[in-house]
Amino acid sequence: MLTAEEKAAVTAFWGKVHVDEVGGEALGRLLVVYPWTQRFFESFGDLSTADAVMNNPKVKAHGKKVLDSFSNGMKHLDDLKGTFAALSELHCDKLHVDPENFKLLGNVLVVVLARHFGKEFTPVLQADFQKVVAGVANALAHRYH
């Protein structure tokens, strides 16, 4: 998946990420750009407009929770399937989330990182993070196979 150099680069960069801010924005953008994903968050209240979604405290809180789990995965890049096994089971068996949504969220996360970090988020880092989010999406979809 990742070389030792790529792991070092993404891990060092991830230390700069404010998961509360980035997580809320990434989940919010997912819900706005792919509105069918909102069906999993009906209990979150008003998701009727982009502003409502982006300012919804439950979206922000869940986005932080998602990125807290992602942060845990960043500590276990060599065992993403093991790290995300319980979440894969939850999302497959209980929540019935389409595993394609994990890929969508990963791609949105990369866009949000680029927005927050600008030129510091180099093309090389972007490529490395694309590998990470693909690995996480694959690990989360593992239970579906």
Curated annotation (Swiss-Prot):
It comes from Bubalus bubalis (Domestic water buffalo). Residues 1-145 form the Globin domain. Transmembrane segments: none annotated. The modification Phosphoserine is found at residue 43. Keywords: Acetylation, Heme, Iron, Metal-binding, Oxygen transport, Phosphoprotein, S-nitrosylation, Transport. The keyword Aminoacyl-tRNA synthetase does not apply. It holds the Pfam family Globin. Belongs to the globin family. The lineage of its organism: Eukaryota, Metazoa, Chordata, Craniata, Vertebrata. The gene is HBB. InterPro entries: Globin, Globin-like_sf, Globin/Proto, Hemoglobin_b, Hemoglobin_oxygen_transport. Heme b binds at residues 62, 91. GO terms for molecular function: haptoglobin binding; heme binding; hemoglobin alpha binding; metal ion binding; organic acid binding; oxygen binding; oxygen carrier activity; peroxidase activity. This is Hemoglobin subunit beta. The keyword Metal-binding applies. The modification S-nitrosocysteine is found at residue 92. Heterotetramer of two alpha chains and two beta chains. The modification N6-acetyllysine is found at residues 58, 81.
